[in-house]
């Protein structure tokens, strides 16, 4: 993670990634967007050098921790585990990420 999540136009970048069928990048951006949402709500203390596990430990509310653990699992497997992702699987997985839009 090299970019400051507070300076990214997520909606535009996600739309561009989906339009170019770069679903792995779209998932990465959804994950970063969720980190920003959690940071903005003071549920995590975002720092560029923290790990996903660090954020999981910080989240105390189980109603947020459980879905965060799920998207972290998806993110890790899709972005680092080379889990194959096409438009159909993206459509299924994106619902898990969009839960945080309502936090």
Identify the residue ranges that each predicted region occupies:
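Charged alpha-helical initiation segments
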Residues: 1-15
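Membrane-proximal, non-transmembrane interaction modules
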Residues: 11-103
């Amino acid at each position: 993670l090299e970019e400051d999540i507070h300076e990214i136009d997520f909606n535009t970048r996600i739309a561009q990634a989906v339009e170019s069928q770069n679903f792995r990048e779209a998932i990465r951006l959804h994950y970063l967007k969720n980190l920003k949402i959690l940071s903005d709500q003071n549920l995590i203390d975002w720092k560029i050098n923290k790990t996903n596990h660090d954020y999981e430990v910080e989240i105390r509310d189980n109603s947020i921790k459980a879905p965060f653990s799920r998207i972290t699992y998806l993110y890790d497997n899709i972005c680092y585990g080379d889990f194959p992702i096409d438009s159909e699987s993206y459509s299924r997985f994106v619902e898990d990420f969009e839960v945080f839009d309502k936090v």
